[in-house]
């Protein structure tokens, strides 16, 4: 069985917090989008950030799964 490198151990120690922070930011963006429903410029900016955060979250989930197999 493959073992974690030092860097992977560091990442494993912080990844749950990273995921939680991303989930919280996504929820905040979604609330902000509802509050700015008629401001299309603001909505476009928020949607771009939301897409980026969702993509980052997906990558963190995949990384979490990989690291959990090594733990």
Predicted regions mapped to residue ranges:
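Charged, heptad-repeat coiled-coil alpha-helices that serve as long linker/dimerization "arms"
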Residues: 1-71
